[in-house]
From Swiss-Prot:
Keywords: Heme, Hydrogen peroxide, Iron, Metal-binding, Oxidoreductase, Peroxidase, Peroxisome
Protein name in UniProt: Catalase isozyme 2
Enzyme Commission (EC) number: 1.11.1.6
Residues that hold heme according to the record: Y348
Location in or out of the cell: Peroxisome
Molecular function GO labels: catalase activity; heme binding; metal ion binding
Main location: other
């Protein structure tokens, strides 16, 4: 055994306690003092090391999606889509790929209850033979905003007041009163499904539009969806209060206990596809993340199944150090020009480097399971042992070569540099259609939640009026009911 390559594989591989450097500890109960009652000596390195390590146990919390739970499993292809993509993990029915999935709430802190009204993260990391693929989505198929320039401000508005650290409706509704594209997302968040019963009983969505590329180089727009085989279940407010009051980690425990009992959660992945040549045929922009694609025109097509059959065995390594980035794709899957997706391509990898360090992809949960090779060396917390002499490319002493060329989208882009909004905003049609699809009692609960939110005493008459105007444009009767209950007229 090479002692320079040896690393402990377990905390229990020594019969006695040791320091971090391996020295035996004969007393892990008492500090080193001058006499039985004298002062503690600074030279007690074991004490100093123990306290210093304890002081640094917690790593930086995620800015969003801090509260989460993870599980391992597999993705299996059940339907052939090789005509759409050259992605190796989608090459044929029956192919299985190991995955790790992280579910989360979005806005609230790491220890917050899992019964708060909040979107839920649904992120899947595929460990494919051609590298990792991160599909970083939510349980809702749309988002609040369509341009990443607004993302920091949006998160600030949703987070607690920086003065009082209290999350307040007036801040949220003030910000989004400037962004009517958020209405569609609010028809999900303020709906009954705004509080999922647990992680097993909720949908998943890739949210953004991605691109599939086949071996011939043909590109197809795609949206990814996950449907739970056990159905979607949610909590109404009264039950959410009871459940959260009894156990603030109820969804994490439900996921863990279900897998431990052999009741493996399963989802049916499906896709919607669209040829780029058809994107101008709709009354909305298909790359607008605040919109859904109509399923009657672009139906869901089954792809496979996702099964979670193994619990994680270390929360820090497999949940807190688990890092997802929409930029991590594989041959056959690519991005689109969705403005929010383009922003997340940079932002997510950047926040992981801040939170976990520049070598976060060496951590066990994030490292690819396939062979990999590059000349990315050193840096903070680099723990990969390498003994090569060649750390540059190309070299006649190193036989590594370029991989076989694989197709990427060949879209021709032209236009002038400008900062502008998209042409087809169409902010009110889909929110109105979704509201009208609710049953009368579901509509009533939706209205009641909005009345409560708009009744915040710090919300001005102007802001209430703007929101009623927005909802009136989505559905006239909805706007009238809100105006009547709040005694406010629309602003137009």
């Amino acid at each position: 055994m090479d002692p320079y390559k040896y690393r402990p594989s377990s905390a229990f591989n020594s019969p006695f306690c040791t320091t971090n450097s391996g020295a035996p500890v004969f007393n892990n109960n008492s500090s080193l003092t001058v006499g039985a009652r004298g002062p503690v000596l600074l030279e007690d390195y074991h004490l100093v090391e123990k306290l210093a390590n304890f002081d640094r146990e917690r790593i930086a919390e995620r800015v969003v999606h801090a509260r989460g739970a993870s599980a391992k499993g597999f993705f299996e292809v059940t339907h052939d889509i090789a005509h759409l993509t050259c992605a190796d993990f989608l090459r044929a029915p029956g192919v299985q790929t190991p995955v790790i999935v992280r579910f989360s709430t979005v806005i609230h802190e790491r220890g917050s209850p899992e019964t708060l009204r909040d979107p839920r993260g649904f992120a899947v990391k595929f460990y494919t033979r051609e590298g990792n693929f991160d599909l970083v989505g939510n349980n809702f198929p749309v988002f609040f905003i369509r341009d990443g320039m607004k993302f920091p401000d949006m998160v600030h508005a949703l987070k607690p007041n920086p003065k009082s650290h209290i999350q307040e409706n007036w801040r949220v509704l003030d910000f989004f009163s400037h962004h009517p594209e958020s209405l569609h997302m609010f028809t999900f968040l303020f709906d009954d499904i705004g509080i999922p019963q647990d992680y097993r009983h909720m949908d998943g969505s890739g949210v953004h539009t991605f691109t599939l590329i086949n071996r011939a180089g043909k590109s197809t727009y795609v949206k990814f969806h996950w449907k739970p085989t056990c159905g979607v279940k949610s909590l109404l407010e009264e039950k959410a209060i009871r459940v959260g009051g009894a156990n603030h980690s109820h969804a994490t425990q439900d996921l863990y206990d279900s897998i431990a009992a052999g009741n493996y959660p399963e989802w049916k992945p499906s896709i919607q596809i669209m040829g780029p040549e058809h994107e101008d045929k709709f009354d909305f922009d298909p790359l607008d993340v605040t919109k859904t694609w109509p399923e009657d025109i672009l139906p869901l097509q089954p792809v496979g199944r996702l099964v979670l059959n193994k619990n994680i065995d270390n929360f820090l390594y497999m949940n807190e150090q688990l890092a997802f980035c929409p930029s991590i794709v594989v041959p056959g899957v690519y991005y689109s020009d969705d403005k929010m997706l383009q922003t997340r391509i940079f932002s997510y990898s950047d926040t992981q480097r801040y939170r976990l360090g520049p070598n976060y992809l060496q951590l066990p949960a994030n490292a690819p399971k396939c062979a990999h090779h590059n000349n990315h060396y050193d840096g903070s917390m680099n723990f990969m042992h390498r003994d090569e002499e060649i750390d540059y490319f190309p070299s006649r002493y190193d036989q590594v070569r370029h991989a076989e060329v694989y197709p990427i989208p060949s879209t021709v882009c032209s236009g002038k540099r400008e900062k502008c909004i998209i042409q087809k905003e169409n902010n009110f049609k889909q929110p109105g259609e979704r509201y009208r699809s609710f049953t009368p009692d579901r509509q009533e609960r939706f209205i009641r939640r909005w009345v409560e939110a708009l009744s915040d005493p710090r919300i001005t008459y102007e802001i209430r009026s703007i929101w009623i105007t927005y909802w009136s444009q989505a559905d006239k009767s909805l706007g009238q009911k809100l105006a009547s209950r709040l005694n406010v007229r629309p602003s137009i």
